[in-house]
Amino acid sequence: MSSKIGQQIMRFLLLCFIAFSVIAEDADPDVIYNYHKINDTLSTAGQLLPVHVAKLQRENFQLVINLAVADKARNLDESYTITHAGINYVQIPVVWDTPTLDDLDLFFSMMDARGERKTLVHCFANYRASAFTYLYRVLKEGVPEADARKDMMQIWSDDAFTKYPQWRAFIDKALVNGA
């Protein structure tokens, strides 16, 4: 019985891999999942695919900060592909269930060090990226909270915060602590 279950699991995983490969090959190079432009030097987005690197080059991005954890199926060659294209790349693996103030502090350091470099902050779905960017804008750049929240809520919703309460708690904690 367990052999049949194992075979079914392997078939399912193979189908998922094939589906992801087809999606990646057919992806529109100009459409990045959950992309949101905040201003001329800062944008956030979901997962990048290799076909998106040309768009990053055309739009003169100079730095990509990836807040997703390493995932063989989603971002195995991402750092190589982006740096090979001449774009600086930093990965801060923020664990979805347990974002920390240390993660945020490292992100703030990277954002402070970027200067005026055109930057894309991303993760798998733009939840981590938009939340961290919101906190940076409010706590470090002095952007009015309502303005920064409006950008974050282009990605998040009240339902998402209900579904992922650890993120509302994390954001509240960061705001109270001033990160």
Q: Whereabouts are the PLM-identified features?
A:
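N-terminal secretory signal peptides that target proteins for export/translocation
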Residues: 1-7
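Sec-dependent signal peptide recognition
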Residues: 7-15
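N-terminal signal peptide c-region/cleavage motif recognized by signal peptidases
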Residues: 19-21
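Cys-dependent protein tyrosine phosphatase-like superfamily
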Residues: 24-119, 134-179
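A phosphate-binding catalytic loop at a beta-strand-loop-alpha-helix junction
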Residues: 119-130
